[in-house]
A protein has these predicted regions:
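Radical SAM [4Fe-4S] cluster-binding motif and immediate context
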Residues: 171-347, 354, 369
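Acidic, low-complexity intrinsically disordered segments
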Residues: 1-237, 245
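Catalytic cores of alpha/beta
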Residues: 104-109, 296, 357-373
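Conserved acidic residues
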Residues: 62, 112, 251, 306, ...
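Radical SAM enzyme core and accessory elements
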Residues: 2-6, 25-26, 30, 46, ...
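Hydrophobic/aromatic residues located in beta-strands of well-ordered beta-sheets
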Residues: 3, 93, 139, 253, ...
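Flexible glycine/acidic-rich beta-alpha junction loops that bind and position SAM and/or redox cofactors
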Residues: 40, 103, 206, 219, ...
Length: 514
C-alpha cells in the first residue's frame, strides 16, 4: 500500500510519526512522510500553492495520516479539507496524535478515522484491512465514520509495554518531504540542523494540571502494567549508533523524555558507560528537581551531557495547590546546588510558567525570589500558561465565567507570545512583565537584560503597589517586549534558519552558556 503521513508540527522532529512510518515500512508498505513545518504563529495558515503541491504528493496514496496537536488543529483541518476537495479519488484520512487521542469527538468531524492512543498497532491493522478490502470498524483504538456519517467508537488496546519491540524510527530521508519557502521539497540531511530529537521512553507518572499526560494516564488506567515505559539501554545505544553513522553532520542528540532523570540510577549508569564508550557525542536531556541526584548528574556529565532543562514551573505554593506537582522549593534549591558543581561543563536551563490567573502577586514575587537565590550561572526560560483542553487547570478555569475568554483564546497563542498573553489575562501585569523580562542568561548581576539591582528596585512594595494601580509603565514595557518578540520571530529566526549547519551547531553550543 502507498501511505502518506503528514506532520503539521512546527519542526521536523516528530518521533511519533516516524515510528508509525517505521512500523508500516517493516510490514512492506510504501510510506512517505511530509513535514509541513510552518511558522510558530498558529494564526497563520498554508497557502494554496503549498497545499496543491501536497495534493500532488498524495494523489496516488491508498491511505493518508495527519498528526495533530491542539495548537496545529486548525492547520490539520485546512490540510484535510483541501485534500478531500482536490483529490480526484476518495482516499481515507486518519488523524492521530495527542489531540485526537484526548478529543476524538472533535476530530472525527473532519477526519474519516481517528486513532486514539498508541497508534503503531492500530494503524498497522488499518492498513492491512484496507489492503485486503476488509471492514475497519472493529479495529481497537479507532473511531470510524461510515458512509452514513455514523461513528463507531472502538475501545483502546493496552499500551505497548515492551518498547524494544518497536523498530528504529524512520530516518530514511529519501522518502521525506519538507515545506520551505512555500515549496515542498525533498528532505535533506541539513534540515536536521546537526541534531536529532530522541525519546528513550514513554509516559510520565506525574499529574501536573497544565499537562495532557495526566489525561493519557486516565485513558489507560487499568489497561497497562506501567504508565512509564523505557527502551533498554542496548536498544538506545544501537539506535543512536545507527543514526550517528547515517548522518555525518550530526553533532548531538537531544533526549526529549519528559524526565530522563526519572530513570533509576543503575540504568543511567549503564547508559552513560555504554554511551561514552560507543557513541562519544554530546547530548542533552530533561529532568526535574525531585529526581536529580549527585550520582546521576556526575555520570551524565562524564558521558557527554552538556545541557539539561529542569522544570521548576512555579513557587512551592503554586506547584502544590495549582499545578499539583508536589515539588518543594527545598528540592529545587538542592537540585540547583548539585547542578552548579558542574557549571564549567553543564549548561542548565530552568523552565518556569507565568501569566497564571490563579496566582496572586505574592506567588509571582516568590517565584522571582526563588530564581534570585538559585546558584548561578544558568539560563531561565519563561513560558506563559496555555490552557490545553481537558487538562485540570483548563477544567478549573472553565468553571469561572470571568476566565471564559482567557480559556478560549490562550490555546491559540504560543507560550512565548509574551505581550499577547499578558494583555489577554491582565492579572498582576507589572509583576508578570518583570518575570518575562528576566528571561535569558543569568549571572550574579543580571537576569537576561535586567540588572539584579533593577529587579530589586522594581520589587519594592511601594513600586509594586503604584505600578499595579497605574499600569502606564507596564504598557510601555509591553510595547518593548512586543518589538523584541516581533524582531525575534520575523527577523532573527528566519536569518538563523538560513545559516549553514556548522553555524547552527556552534551557536547551539554557546546559546545557553553564561
Amino acid at each position: 500500500m502507498r501511505i502518506i503521513l503528514i506532520s503539521a508540527a512546527t519542526f521536523p522532529s516528530d518521533q511519533g510519526i516516524r515510528t508509525i512510518s517505521a512500523i508500516l515500512k517493516k510490514a512492506g508498505h510504501d510510506v512517505k512522510i511530509v513535514f509541513m513545518a510552518y511558522s510558530e504563529d498558529y494564526s497563520k495558515f498554508y497557502h494554496n500553492r503549498e497545499l496543491n503541491q501536497l495534493v500532488n504528493i498524495c494523489k496516488n496514496a491508498d491511505l493518508i495520516g495527519v498528526n495533530c496537536y491542539v495548537s496545529t488543529m486548525p492547520r490539520a483541518i485546512q490540510i484535510t479539507g483541501f485534500l478531500k476537495k482536490k483529490l480526484k479519488k476518495e482516499i481515507p484520512i486518519v488523524w492521530g496524535g495527542i489531540h485526537p487521542t484526548l478529543f476524538p469527538q472533535d476530530c472525527i468531524k473532519y477526519a474519516d478515522i481517528v486513532c486514539v492512543g498508541d497508534g503503531e498497532d492500530a494503524v498497522l491493522d488499518l492498513a492491512k484491512a484496507i489492503e485486503n478490502k476488509k471492514p475497519i470498524d472493529k479495529i481497537q483504538n479507532l473511531w470510524v465514520k461510515d458512509k452514513n456519517g455514523e461513528i463507531v467508537k472502538n475501545p483502546v488496546r493496552p499500551f505497548i509495554d515492551i518498547l524494544d519491540t518497536l523498530p528504529f524510527v524512520d530516518y530514511d530521508i529519501e522518502d521525506h518531504y519538507i515545506l520551505e519557502n512555500h515549496n515542498l521539497r525533498k528532505f535533506k540531511e541539513e534540515d536536521l540542523n546537526g541534531q536529532i530529537f530522541f525519546l528513550t521512553g514513554r509516559g510520565c507518572p506525574y499529574g501536573c494540571t497544565y499537562c495532557s499526560n495526566n489525561l493519557l494516564n486516565e485513558l489507560y488506567k487499568g489497561k497497562c502494567k506501567s504508565i512509564v515505559r523505557w527502551h533498554s539501554v542496548d536498544y538506545i545505544i544501537e539506535h543512536v549508533l545507527y543514526l550517528k553513522k547515517r548522518f555525518k553532520t550530526l553533532s548531538y542528540f537531544d533526549i526529549r523524555d519528559d524526565t530522563f532523570s526519572l530513570r533509576p540510577l543503575s540504568q543511567i549508569q549503564e547508559f552513560c558507560e555504554k554511551y561514552k564508550e560507543k557513541v562519544n557525542m554530546r547530548f542533552k536531556c530533561l529532568g526535574d528537581p525531585k529526581t536529580i541526584s549527585e550520582d546521576k548528574i556526575k555520570v551524565l556529565v562524564d558521558a557527554g551531557c552538556t545541557d539539561i532543562i529542569i522544570g521548576i514551573q512555579g513557587n512551592e505554593k503554586t506547584n502544590r495547590d495549582i499545578y499539583k506537582r508536589g515539588q518543594t522549593n527545598e528540592q529545587v534549591l538542592k537540585a540547583g546546588k548539585i547542578l552548579s558543581k558542574y557549571k564549567n561543563k553543564l549548561a542548565v536551563m530552568y523552565d518556569v510558567i507565568t501569566c497564571n490567573p490563579f496566582e496572586d502577586a505574592k506567588d509571582v514575587i516568590d517565584l522571582i525570589r526563588l530564581l534570585q537565590i538559585l546558584p548561578k550561572p544558568y539560563y531561565v526560560s519563561v513560558n506563559n500558561l496555555v490552557f490545553f483542553p481537558g487538562t485540570g487547570i483548563y477544567e478549573r478555569a472553565k468553571m469561572n465565567p470571568k476566565l471564559k475568554k482567557i480559556v478560549e483564546e490562550s490555546s491559540k497563542l504560543n507560550y512565548w507570545d509574551r505581550n499577547k498573553h499578558i494583555l489577554l489575562k491582565r492579572k498582576d501585569m507589572y509583576l508578570v512583565l518583570i518575570l518575562n523580562l528576566m528571561r535569558g542568561s543569568v549571572t550574579e548581576n543580571r537576569f537576561g537584560l535586567m540588572p539584579n539591582k533593577l529587579i530589586n528596585y522594581l520589587l519594592k512594595p511601594s513600586r509594586i503597589k503604584y505600578n499595579l494601580n497605574n499600569p502606564a509603565l507596564t504598557y510601555i514595557g509591553l510595547s518593548f517586549v512586543s518589538v523584541m518578540d516581533l524582531t525575534r520571530e520575523r527577523i532573527a529566526k528566519p536569518l538563523y534558519r538560513s545559516t549553514p549547519v556548522n553555524f547552527k551547531v556552534w551557536y547551539d553550543k554557546i546559546r545557553y552558556r553564561v
